[in-house]
Structure formats: structure tokens, C-alpha cells
């Protein structure tokens, strides 16, 4: 079994920056990319990985079934806890957990090796600045923030700009039109 990424997804995945920000239109494949990124870190021993969405319902609806399906295809799953939404990886004992940012204080106290903030523009910025940023500080964990555009007044734009100015950050932006074109070109290439 092989992971296949589009060229834009591969470009993002290949970035060696500690903090990566993706703003893209719908149907880019943000969730699929997030899952492949979690797998990259879960392949290492004893990693603690969190996927955080604005609400637990969103985390489950967006990611949970896809994550389980892909990990199962690779035969990576040792244990699934449906109550805590946590998967333990067979060979490495790493864990992937889905979390909600709607009560940020419940996210305190855990050191993380990798953190995904999905639809992060809809997450209260205090969850990042007051809670989650600290969770990757002592571990020097990596972060991938992704979501759809919410405008210049949203904190997501501030994070996007960091990727253009801070050497530890990288930012990527793709419009829905560019995404549609990329998928169309990939489909045409597969047919030929």
C-alpha cells in the first residue's frame, strides 16, 4: 500500500519547517494530508499526536472514520478506544487522539510531538496561544494548521503571515480554482 499525494500536498508535506500553515479552498484534501502527516509521526516510537478541531463532532465527522480506514489498510492499529477517540499504533506504540478545542482548558498539561489544528480559523485563538502552543514547547513538537480562508481579520491570517516572515514557519495557500485544476490535471494524467 502506498500513500499518494498531489503536487501541492507533497510540497506541504516536504516542508521541514516546525510550524506549517495551509489555507485552501474546499476539496483540497486537507484531511487526507493531515492523516498522512499524522502517519509520518506515528511511524516513530512513542509519539503523542493530537488532531484538534473546533468541536468534537467536527473531529469525528471530518477525520475519525477516514483515519481508522487508512490506518487499518496499512495494518497499523493495535488498539482503538472509541470513547477517548484514541488509536494506538502497533509497532511504535505511538498514539493518535482526536480532540475538541471548544473547552481549551481541557487540553492543558500534555506534551505533544505533533499537533494538527484543523479548521483552525474556527478555533478560539486563545486555545492556541494560551494552551496548545505550550504543549509542543518542551517536546519541540511540530504543528500543522489547516483550514479554509476566513478573511484578513481572523487570527488564521496572522498565522499565515508568520509563515512568510518567521524562519520556523511555512505557509501555503491554494484557491478552490487551483485545487480543482490540480485534481483535474491529476485525473487527466492518470487516464493517459
Please state what every model-predicted region is:
Residues 1-185, 191:
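Phosphate/NTP-binding elements of NTP-utilizing enzymes
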Amino acid at each position: 500500500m502506498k500513500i499518494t499525494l498531489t503536487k501541492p500536498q507533497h510540497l506541504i508535506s516536504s516542508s521541514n519547517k516546525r510550524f506549517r500553515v495551509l489555507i485552501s479552498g474546499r476539496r483540497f484534501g486537507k484531511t487526507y494530508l493531515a492523516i498522512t502527516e499524522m502517519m509520518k509521526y506515528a511511524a516513530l516510537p512513542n509519539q503523542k499526536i493530537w488532531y484538534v478541531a473546533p468541536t468534537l463532532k467536527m473531529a469525528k465527522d471530518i477525520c475519525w472514520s477516514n483515519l481508522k480506514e487508512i490506518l487499518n489498510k496499512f495494518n497499523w492499529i493495535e488498539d482503538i478506544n472509541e470513547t477517548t477517540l484514541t488509536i494506538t499504533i502497533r509497532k511504535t506504540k505511538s498514539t493518535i487522539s482526536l480532540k475538541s478545542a471548544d473547552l481549551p482548558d481541557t487540553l492543558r498539561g500534555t506534551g505533544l510531538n505533533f499537533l494538527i489544528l484543523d479548521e483552525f480559523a474556527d478555533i478560539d485563538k486563545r486555545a492556541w496561544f494560551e494552551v496548545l502552543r505550550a504543549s509542543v514547547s518542551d517536546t519541540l513538537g511540530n504543528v500543522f494548521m489547516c483550514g479554509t480562508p476566513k478573511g484578513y481579520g481572523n487570527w488564521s491570517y496572522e498565522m499565515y503571515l508568520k509563515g512568510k516572515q518567521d524562519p520556523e514557519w511555512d505557509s501555503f495557500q491554494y484557491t478552490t480554482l487551483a485545487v480543482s485544476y490540480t485534481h483535474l490535471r491529476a485525473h487527466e494524467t492518470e487516464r493517459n
